[in-house]
Amino acid sequence: MDTITLTDHHFLHILQLASSALPVGAYSYSEGLETLVESGTITSQSTLQQWLEAELSYGAIRLEAAVMVRSYQATIMGEMETLRYWNLWLSAARETQELRNSSWQMGRSLMQLLGKIQPEILSLANSVGNPCNYAIAFAIASAHWQVNIQAALLAYLHSWATNLITAGVKLIPLGQTAGQELLLQLQPLISHATVEIMSLKDDELSCCSWGLSLASMQHETQYTRLFRS
């Protein structure tokens, strides 16, 4: 991976976007993990690590992240029609109602937040329309703040991993130290996935996420739930 140079200003912006304190509701989603723990598929730190590594290697998060990159570029170039296209494309690519709704809810929350703290973004938000996927909203914010796209992608994947590890810590359960150890172990793969995703062409966008989709569908009727997905 190339060396990334950020000004203090840009570094602080991306830290804010990737923070678990960002009020977009990410903490309320497990992306099917709750069902996988309930069924006994994920029972430990090692099985959670295997699941997250598989998702980073060929799962739906790669598709989502690739669309984030394209939306960032469209925002920088002022290509609103392209931005709307990728928003619709990502909505169509969601395989379950829970996954689609979670992306829309987080995207809406982020755009509403940005509209209040950075009102000049409102015109971009309005041009995308509603519903807006979270990856699109994240891309708009990163581009508006002129954060390096590679840094933005790293932050996006790291934030995703942090959220699911936090869910795993609660559900399995795991200790906080185990969660941080797992996040550290995922760093090389997050870095590698970033390089791969940055180089993908449009006709190479694909994923293998049937496990996630089945878990998400089963979660919709799961009797006892802590999470919304």
From Swiss-Prot:
It is found in: Cytoplasm. Keywords: Chaperone, Cytoplasm, Nickel insertion. It comes from the Bacteria. GO terms for molecular function: nickel cation binding. Gene3D superfamilies: Urease accessory protein UreF. One of its GO terms (cellular component) is cytoplasm. Coiled coil: none annotated. It holds the Pfam family UreF. Belongs to the UreF family. UreD, UreF and UreG form a complex that acts as a GTP-hydrolysis-dependent molecular chaperone, activating the urease apoprotein by helping to assemble the nickel containing metallocenter of UreC. The UreE protein probably delivers the nickel. Required for maturation of urease via the functional incorporation of the urease nickel metallocenter. This is Urease accessory protein UreF. It comes from Trichormus variabilis (strain ATCC 29413 / PCC 7937). The lineage of its organism: Bacteria, Bacillati, Cyanobacteriota, Cyanophyceae, Nostocales. The gene is ureF.
